[in-house]
Regions:
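Asparagine-centered strand-capping/turn motif at beta-strand->loop junctions
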Residues: 102-106
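N-terminal low-complexity, Pro/Thr/Ser-rich intrinsically disordered segments
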Residues: 3-20
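Short acidic-glycine-tyrosine-enriched beta hairpin
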Residues: 72-96
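A short glycine-rich, His/Asp/Glu-containing loop-to-beta-strand
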Residues: 20-47, 52-57, 112-115
C-alpha cells in the first residue's frame, strides 16, 4: 500500500500515534505493518490526525461518536446508522489523509485494533 503524502515533518506529526498518543498505542511495528490499539473514553476527543496507510480494523467496543474535519465541520455521526462500525466488526479502510478528529459522545469506551498495511 502506498503511503499518503506524509513525508514531511508536519504530516508525520499528524500521524495518529504521534498526534494522539493517549489514544493510539503501537503494539507492533516493522517495515510492512503497524498494529495499533485505539481507545477513546467517554467524553474524550481524539485531536486532529490522519491515517498514513490502508488499514484492517477490528472493533472491540463501540460507543456513539462524532467525526469532524479540520474546520470543525461534522463529517460523521455514528447515530445515523450508516457505518460499518459495530462491536465485533472487521472492515478495511483506505489511507485517510484528511485531518479529522473523533469525539466519543457515548457512555462506553471506543476500542479497536488496527493493522496498518505499509506496502
Amino acid at each position: 500500500m502506498k503511503e499518503n503524502n506524509t513525508t514531511d515533518e508536519t504530516a508525520l506529526s499528524l500521524d495518529g500515534p504521534v498526534a494522539a498518543p493517549q489514544h493510539h498505542t503501537v503494539l507492533f511495528e516493522n517495515d510492512r505493518i503497524r498494529v495499533v490499539d485505539f481507545r477513546v473514553g467517554p467524553g474524550d476527543t481524539v485531536p486532529l490526525h490522519t491515517h498514513r496507510w490502508a488499514t484492517v480494523n477490528y472493533v472491540i467496543t463501540l460507543s456513539d461518536f462524532l467525526s469532524r474535519d479540520s474546520d470543525g465541520n461534522l463529517k460523521h455521526d455514528s447515530r445515523d446508522g450508516d457505518s460499518p462500525q459495530r462491536e465485533g466488526a472487521v472492515f478495511c479502510m483506505p489511507a485517510f489523509p484528511p485531518l479529522h478528529s473523533v469525539e466519543n459522545i457515548g457512555c462506553g469506551e471506543i476500542r479497536g485494533i488496527t493493522v496498518e498495511l505499509k506496502d
